[in-house]
A protein has these predicted regions:
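Death-fold interaction domains
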Residues: 20, 35-37, 215
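Beta-strand-rich extracellular modules
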Residues: 12, 24-30, 110-112, 212-214
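Generic structural detector for well-ordered beta-strands
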Residues: 8-10, 24, 39-41, 156
Length: 234
């Protein structure tokens, strides 16, 4: 405000990610032009998305939330590791918090790049949702039923019993099979229907899931399996 003049800048509510802009003001006294500028930063909502959606974003300051399975750890103490979900894999670079291989984690960070490859930058470990144990299909079938213990299974889909709820049989290279009663991609369990069909998952595809061991009519099975990896047959 100067000599009775006032400039008012109003920003609309930000329902997206963080955003920044620069407002340039120009005035004149009739002889000389004066310019000033003001940088404005507005925090936004943290945007939840899949790994594939994150990888497709541009480098910037928007904060994203991803949930994935830790598939490789370069340096746990330094927060350098890979996470994957059913859509793909991404590198997490120097995130706060410490993780272990086969943890299911939720990460918040920005889309950064290194030599053109997307990665999670300025990351923060929001939550270790669960820790799972990798196991062979044979050992899984022989394991005791336990609703509190999580396993990581990998196998090729050999039969889709129900594509609406994701009831499938998977098989390993030794011919061992496991029945999965329900496969979906949402760790929260809110979206359990049509995961198989919506994502074009078919017989012959290899999937990696995190699941508990249960039984039905004395037959072993995995239940409520969350998919953290898909390798297409073709």
């Amino acid at each position: 405000k100067n000599g009775g003049s006032e400039v008012v800048f109003k920003a609309a509510p930000n329902t997206g990610g963080d955003r920044n802009t620069t407002v340039i003001f120009k005035t004149t006294d009739g002889k000389k032009e004066y310019t000033s500028q003001m940088a404005i930063a507005q925090k936004g909502a943290i945007v939840p998305l899949t790994v594939a959606e994150f990888n497709a974003k541009e480098v910037g300051d928007v904060q994203y939330r991803l949930t994935g399975l830790v598939t490789k750890v370069d340096d746990a103490a330094a927060g350098k590791y890979y996470i994957s979900d059913y859509t793909g894999q991404v590198y997490v670079y120097k995130a706060s918090g410490e993780v272990s291989l086969n943890d299911v984690v939720t990460i918040v960070g920005k889309h950064a790049e290194f030599k053109g490859t997307p990665q999670v930058g300025s990351g923060k470990l929001e939550e270790v949702c669960a820790s799972a144990e990798p196991i062979s299909l044979a050992d899984f079938n022989a394991a005791a039923d336990d609703n509190d213990k999580l396993y990581v299974l990998t196998g090729k889909i050999v039969e889709i019993v129900n594509d609406k709820y994701g009831n499938v049989y998977i098989e390993d290279e030794n011919g061992e099979k496991v029945y999965l009663y329900g496969v979906y991609g949402d760790w929260t369990g809110e979206n359990k229907k049509n995961f198989i069909t919506d994502n074009g998952i078919a017989v012959g595809d290899e999937i990696t899931v995190v699941t508990i061991k249960t039984s039905h009519n004395d037959a072993p099975q995995g239940k409520n399996a969350v998919c953290f990896g898909v390798k297409k047959a073709n």
